Amino acid sequence: MCSSDLERIQLNEDTLWAGGPYNPANPEAKGALPEIRRLLAEGQNQAAQALVQQKFLAVPRTQMPYQTVGDLLITMSGGAVAENYRRELDLDTAVARTELQVGSVRQVREVFASVPDQAILVRLSATGGTLAFTLSFASPQRSTFRTEGGNMLVLSGQNGDSAGIKGALKFECRAVVTATGGQVTADDHQLHVSGASSVTIAVAAATSYRRYDDVSGDPAALTRQSLAALQGKPFDDLRRRAVEEHQRLFRRVALDLGHNAAAEKLPTDERVLQSATTEDPGLAALYFQYGRYLLLGSSRPGTQPANLQGLWNDSLDRKSTRLNSSH
């Protein structure tokens, strides 16, 4: 979601699931197996099925749900009406961009997730004026918020319980702000930026997950390490590295199904609506490339497998994320 005065960046970390390590084996299954076999041999299939349901299935019967870290909120000051508002996602660069005009000030906001640097980068810039905003975290998890060092925002939390399995994962998300011009100040749980011509926000998240039976990791150390590795690197270099890594895979495939020049000039939402009554073969190609973009962003070597939502989820218990083997 994005508006002229609020930028919401929804945050996920692909190892943040509910619950903790557990053994799903039903302790009654072995003892019930001879009776199940006997019933099946005698043709009593329904009775055998009932016994399977009662004593043979995993405990709990459901998988744990994938969960959200929360949101990074950029609340702009001033409240003036925005004009010339434009949002876009460039599939070729994997950069989301927002442009708008607030009075005499033109604002540009860019957001991308960097595979090589394992961070989300946000760049806000202004011409004809300066930027002023408040940066904060929000989360439905059991969490706390604080600031560190005058320019860093920290979200620390614990995952939730599910189906009788206690939450055992700790997680942390950090956002560090670098401003050109102006100043950055902090209160207990927010950062405030004023008078800046441009601002870079680097976001890193981690959990205590190490493997399926080990959640003893140190998410605080991991996030500090990720952000420390970015120090001193110009934003343009970080952007270039992220784009090159994305294009290394994305540009391996091209698909041309034909074109409708008039349809291709429309905003994507209008183009989708019009496609029901208008021949637009290029829209199918766009969907194809969008799917590739999503998969490149949610499944890489060393990551968790993508679930039915890739890795994007703003809920604590969205049922479709339980089907994590579907991809």
Positions of the model-derived regions?
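Short "domain-exit" segments at the C-terminal end of structured domains
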Residues: L323-H327
